[in-house]
């Protein structure tokens, strides 16, 4: 196969749509006449992608919703499997959505279709039993982080570390002034801004919002120039947080609709729920305290399943506790406030942290889409040579 004529891609959510669009653009540079189809989002559609189903039909969360939607999801997967077994694409690329994609990838690869999976499932952290399926499913695993690549090397699973697109798009240096102006925040020089990001889900906000506000209240008590900014992830979270804020009328809080990027950019320090937003905060070079709290039984169950030393991406990438992780019983307002105060009171600590964030940023900045596209081309060329 000297050129790509037809590529199948399946993504399940907005983050995958961003990766898929970047990958499509990079492959189109090499193969302008290549056709792309499968399941994609608006960014991929804008590049001419033929989506056989709406991407939102795969976007399910939690444990209950996937069970309710199981017949529909299985039907979509069966339809795709039949389509690509009958008329095989030059390569199948599953982007994230491992619970949907991996079984499909196994079936297609067994039939001789070259398979790539883009974004490693978190097998390094939990559900390691999936490794056997991954080994059967992929000709190439594209990873966003170097520790994932090291893990797959140990498992003898072919992989390529491509870096993270956010590291490509976020500048190495980011100043606060422009973000504060865009958000309409006070421009007084002596004010210190703390961003609170208690999560995007109702349960996360329920467990973390009040803790974060109590922590901010304690920090504010000794620092009257402190100001609080909270970007609500959506309208539902905005309403939920507004109710909590009624009990904290003495705190100088600005509640936003979305705008989390600018909120983090405007901040001197961040209290943040564990999750992918911690990566963005790190790339913006903002000191942070990572926290998480959930129902006691859920935490007990998760602690039995999770095998990684850390939960926060900055710490996973550094392979050490670069920033505080205060989880469950340690996520008390007093401990959160004390950890936050270190950043507010020590310019030296903050500067040392920023230098380490910068080193990680450079490590992740690899032109992800171009690197991924070339990795796919090289894998297909190697398979072609073996087949000769």
From Swiss-Prot:
It catalyses: a lipid X + a UDP-2-N,3-O-bis[(3R)-3-hydroxyacyl]-alpha-D-glucosamine = a lipid A disaccharide + UDP + H(+). InterPro entries: Glyco_trans_19. GO terms for biological process: lipid A biosynthetic process. GO terms for molecular function: lipid-A-disaccharide synthase activity; phospholipid binding. It is an enzyme of class 2 (transferase). Keywords: Glycosyltransferase, Lipid A biosynthesis, Lipid biosynthesis, Lipid metabolism, Transferase. SUPFAM superfamilies: UDP-Glycosyltransferase/glycogen phosphorylase (SSF53756). GO terms for cellular component: membrane. Pathway: Bacterial outer membrane biogenesis; LPS lipid A biosynthesis. It holds the Pfam family LpxB. The keyword Lipoprotein does not apply. It comes from the Bacteria. Its EC number is 2.4.1.182. Condensation of UDP-2,3-diacylglucosamine and 2,3-diacylglucosamine-1-phosphate to form lipid A disaccharide, a precursor of lipid A, a phosphorylated glycolipid that anchors the lipopolysaccharide to the outer membrane of the cell. PANTHER family: LIPID-A-DISACCHARIDE SYNTHASE, LIPID-A-DISACCHARIDE SYNTHASE, MITOCHONDRIAL-RELATED. Belongs to the LpxB family. This is Lipid-A-disaccharide synthase. It comes from Saccharophagus degradans (strain 2-40 / ATCC 43961 / DSM 17024). The lineage of its organism: Bacteria, Pseudomonadati, Pseudomonadota, Gammaproteobacteria, Cellvibrionales. The gene is lpxB.
